[in-house]
Amino acid sequence: MKSLPLFVCVLVLAGGCTARQRDHFYVLDAQPAGSNESRTQFERQITLRVTVPSLIDRGEMVLTTSSGVMVLDHERWATPLADLVTATLGQDIERRRGDVVVLPKSADQAGIPLVKMVIEIDQVTARLGDKVAIETHWRVTDARTGKVSIGRDVFASPQRPQSYADVASGLSTCIALLAERLVREVPAP
């Protein structure tokens, strides 16, 4: 009889060790939604370099709280956040300007004008029930003319996320708003 309570205790402890919260993975979506058609002809190439704050450039989703930040162990980005932002921003730019291709580095094609974009996301504010926002600054250089455009702005999504998937969607919206602003800096062909 003495072993029955001990056996129950061992079962409870073992059950606690095997019970585990599942991880959820999120991605950013290019906007507007639709297919990104493969193109072989383009008038301009854009090289894109994006940095995000080291605090949020991690596998786990990070939310803003009133006293700091909260790292969510089981709400995760599918790939490093800097890679997600770079890929999504590139797709967003290409969807807005059909005459450009966004590449991680120059294609070294003589005669195809090159524009270099360096984007630094200074702060990401994401909180359930509040708008998602990014504060960013950028430098856009037309390699042919040497013209440099420098800018800084805050982009906020209109929706107020009620779930972690909504946070990812809100961040996608912020990236799309940034792309909308950046394409104005790309010279016409």
Language model features with spans:
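A structural "domain/chain start" motif
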Residues: C17-L81, A188-P189
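Sec-dependent bacterial lipoprotein signal peptides
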Residues: M1-G15
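Mid-chain, structured segments of secreted extracytoplasmic proteins
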Residues: M70-V101
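Short secondary-structure boundary motifs at beta->alpha junctions and helix caps
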Residues: V69-R76, R144-L177
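Surface-exposed short loop/turn segments
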Residues: T18-S35, R96-R144, Q159-P161
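C-terminal/domain-edge helix-coil "capping" segments
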Residues: T18-D29, N36-E37, Q159-P189
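Structured segments of extracytoplasmic/periplasmic soluble domains
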Residues: P53, A87-D99, R181, E185-P189
